[in-house]
Amino acid sequence: MSINIDIKKITDLLNSSILFPDDVQELLREKYIVLERKSNGTPTVAHIYKTMARFDNKSIYRIAKFLFMNRPDVIKLLFLEDVEPLLPDKSINISINNTEYPQLEGPIGTKIALLELFNAFKTGISEPIPYYYLPLRKDINNIVTK
């Protein structure tokens, strides 16, 4: 009996950002998470911040700039060109993002960008935090069951 092991396939599988149970548990313990998504809404990267996104110190705008840094059309729509991005403390890859985003413009594009931004803020714990942080559990369950 011979075992045919393809190192390239194994390497590709490990590099494809498989979400392990330890990663899921870590996300469920984190307080401030920002999800980056594919154009179809599937989460691709969970960015973990140790501090809360706030309007008064403009950190929410800096996080938005980081979230959309590869999408100049969204940065322009949301007037984030002069904002410095705030890097996350840690990022966990959830799935591969190999899709192209549609070009957003005009009032509809602005609404879509804001909707994507407002749905990005998540929390893994159930402590009192601002209203714009939604529970992460639903997203994690969708990822694990796919």
Curated annotation (Swiss-Prot):
GO CC term (a single one): virion component
Induction entry: Expressed in the late phase of the viral replicative cycle.
Quaternary state and interactors: Part of a complex composed of the kinase OPG054, OPG092, OPG100, OPG114, OPG115, OPG142 and OPG157.
Cellular location(s): Virion
Keywords, in A-Z order: Late protein, Virion
Entry protein name: Core protein D2
Coiled-coil intervals, chain numbering: none
InterPro entries given in the database record: Pox_D2
Pfam families (alphabetical): Pox_D2
Tagged with keyword Calcium: no
Protein task: Late protein which is part of a large complex required for early virion morphogenesis. This complex participates in the formation of virosomes and the incorporation of virosomal contents into nascent immature virions.
Tree of life domain: Viruses
Originating gene: OPG114
Protein family per UniProt: Belongs to the orthopoxvirus OPG114 family.
